[in-house]
């Protein structure tokens, strides 16, 4: 009976502490962080990948345009 009373008293002390001091706060914050990360991976990851692909394609087009201009200048200088 003494153990049960001690357990209940200590539980009350922990629960009456400020939420920032409680261990449960850290667990809750971790769960929220994991949830946000999963959500970002599922929804935002696709958009980020599409944006990176579009940027890569644009860079490739710019490189091809520069090479084409360089080739035309060299050809004009040779003729």
From Swiss-Prot:
Propeptide section residues: 47-79
Annotated InterPro entries: Antimicrobial12 (IPR012515)
Region Disordered, annotated ranges: 45-79
GO biological-process terms attached to the record: defense response to bacterium; defense response to fungus; killing of cells of another organism
Biological role stated in the UniProt entry: Antimicrobial peptide with broad-spectrum activity against Gram-positive and Gram-negative bacteria as well as against a variety of fungi. Rapidly inactivates channel catfish herpesvirus (ED(50)=4 uM) and frog virus 3 (ED(50)=13 uM) over a wide temperature range. Seems to disrupt the membranes by adopting an alpha helical conformation and forming toroidal pores. Has hemolytic activity.
Name of protein: Moronecidin
Taxonomic lineage of the native organism: Eukaryota, Metazoa, Chordata, Craniata, Vertebrata
Tissues of expression: Expressed in mast cells in gill, skin and gut, and in lining blood vessels in the viscera. Also in intestine, spleen, anterior kidney, and blood cells.
Biological source species: Morone saxatilis
